[in-house]
Amino acid sequence: MGKVLQKEAFGLAAKDNSGVLSPFSFTRRETGEKDVRFKVLFCGICHSDLHMVKNEWGMSTYPLVPGHEIVGVVTEVGAKVTKFKTGEKVGVGCLVSSCGSCDSCTEGMENYCPKSIQTYGFPYYDNTITYGGYSDHMVCEEGFVIRIPDNLPLDAAAPLLCAGITVYSPMKYHGLDKPGMHIGVVGLGGLGHVGVKFAKAMGTKVTVISTSEKKRDEAINRLGADAFLVSRDPKQIKDAMGTMDGIIDTVSATHSLLPLLGLLKHKGKLVMVGAPEKPLELPVMPLIFERKMVMGSMIGGIKETQEMIDMAGKHNITADIELISADYVNTAMERLEKADVRYRFVIDVANTLKPNPNL
């Protein structure tokens, strides 16, 4: 590969596993013939950003510019770009490239491509490391750019590029999107609250399952869930046993799967999208005797992500956010670690991060 021309950029980076983010000047490649460049307006803070800045998964490369819930406005397109033009509202989620030829890619599931390149902290083809959306602009292959519906507010749409697709994809893929179905959503956090909104928009009956009675009013009266179960209440769980077609489990803390499997109907599906640090016990007998299934799911493919955001536009689905300035990001990370946010932090990049005068 020949020499790649570069363009100055500015963002916030973690320099070591302390996880503290500070101003960082770097370069991005010039706009290639199939690239879309856009000014970043907003970027959501995902819980995985917190893990990555502290190298808690053992895969971080420093300096690390996080952010994979990125939205903005197109400023330049390459000569062979056909889907986008300057001035349009776009976003980039967790992926910026994949091989394009493996079974996963040909099936539209680039998220499972063994050679997929994540939006930050991964080696790119030009021997650079990808930098994410805590920055003033992005450049990305056209095929990994998502069009944002005009009616959606960009700040509240940003988290959908991770949280939204994480809950939407398994519901669609596993057929848990049929009107009249009964769907359980475990956990009412960044993923769970969006899961409730999509499941309701699909026409399903939704029950929120939580350890805390305190979230009942929020779940039913504000988010529109049909029912609420306290997972620590044996009577509530017993009364609801065998009633659910599927459950989306968004919880990352260690918890028992047995009560959740009990809530499922014959052939019911429990989909894990949270990522507990320690292994969970899997009771096998409910799987054998009632053909219940447990599976996992990770974000979604690009076509599926576009479908998700289009559905969000149709039904006015957005994340519930707390908009913050760039200089508040380290405090936000501390609060996120304590689960002190309802439900997603979003950085006002364009108005609070030092601008790049060359844009």
From Swiss-Prot:
Cofactor: Zn(2+)
Amino-acid positions noted as binding NADP(+) in the UniProt annotation, renumbered to this chain: 48, 166, 187-192, 210-215, 250, 274, 297-299
Enzyme class: oxidoreductase
Biological pathway: Aromatic compound metabolism; phenylpropanoid biosynthesis
Reactions this protein catalyses: (E)-cinnamyl alcohol + NADP(+) = (E)-cinnamaldehyde + NADPH + H(+)
Keywords (A to Z) from UniProt: Lignin biosynthesis, Metal-binding, NADP, Oxidoreductase, Zinc
One GO term of the biological process aspect: response to bacterium
GO cellular component entries: plasma membrane
Molecular function GO labels: aryl-alcohol dehydrogenase (NADP+) activity; cinnamyl-alcohol dehydrogenase activity; zinc ion binding
Coiled coil: none
Residues binding Zn(2+) 1: C46, H68, E69, C162
UniProt: Zn(2+) 2 binding residues: C99, C102, C105, C113
InterPro entries per UniProt: ADH-like_C, ADH-like_N, ADH_Zn_CS, CAD-like, GroES-like_sf, NAD(P)-bd_dom_sf, PKS_ER
Signal peptide as annotated in the record: none
EC number annotated for this UniProt entry: 1.1.1.195
SMART domains: PKS_ER
Subunit-level organization: Homodimer.
PANTHER family: ALDEHYDE REDUCTASE
Family recorded in the similarity comment: Belongs to the zinc-containing alcohol dehydrogenase family.
UniProt protein name: Cinnamyl alcohol dehydrogenase 8
Species this protein is from: Arabidopsis thaliana
Phylogenetic classification of the source organism: Eukaryota, Viridiplantae, Streptophyta, Embryophyta, Tracheophyta
